Amino acid sequence: MNKTGYASDPFYLLHETEPHPENPGRLTAIQNRLESSEFYNNLTPIQPRKATVDEIANIHDLGYIASVEQNCADHNRNLDADTVISQDSYNAALLSAGAGMTAIDQLVDGKINNAFCAVRPPGHHAEQDRAMGFCLFNNVAIAARYAQKIKALNKIFIFDWDVHHGNGTQHSFYNDPSVYYASAHQHPFYPGSGAEEETGTGEGLGTTLNLPMDAYS
């Protein structure tokens, strides 16, 4: 029988963002729905670990990482107009980024066949040097680099299925032929990227695929 891992942690709820749309209620709703389902007891629990600064720095500038930590320590409320933070957001973001890497460890070790990571803050809008669209660190991009550097998984395919285009993830690998990034998203819509013509650059030309879709299509 295939084993599906489930990575989450109550600490994610301490990334306090109410009344922002990206708030702890999103994870609470997921957890409640899973617990009421017939397959919940068949999930393999995964306890996420915190990502290290070095692991985050595979994708993000060190200065940006330090600024997120400092803004949270200073009890600032926003990193930008869209991205709300609280005192515990930095550590929640480290734990969020670590979930994907923990899941990869278990996948490679044969303990699970696939995994679902219910984490926050989210990540696919986060750019190399800045927060964007509710996102602090690019969780998927960080996990992809970890899979390559630590687990020797040289070729990575990322499928991003979201109403919003994952600009940060795309930009992380736009000139990298070892990571194929595909996105299906509503267009035109936030953040304005993700046109069909965006297919990569340099050695990465042809390794980005965007599938912009009309609303309700």
Please identify what each model-predicted range represents.
Residues 1-217:
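HDAC/HDAC-like amidohydrolase catalytic core signature
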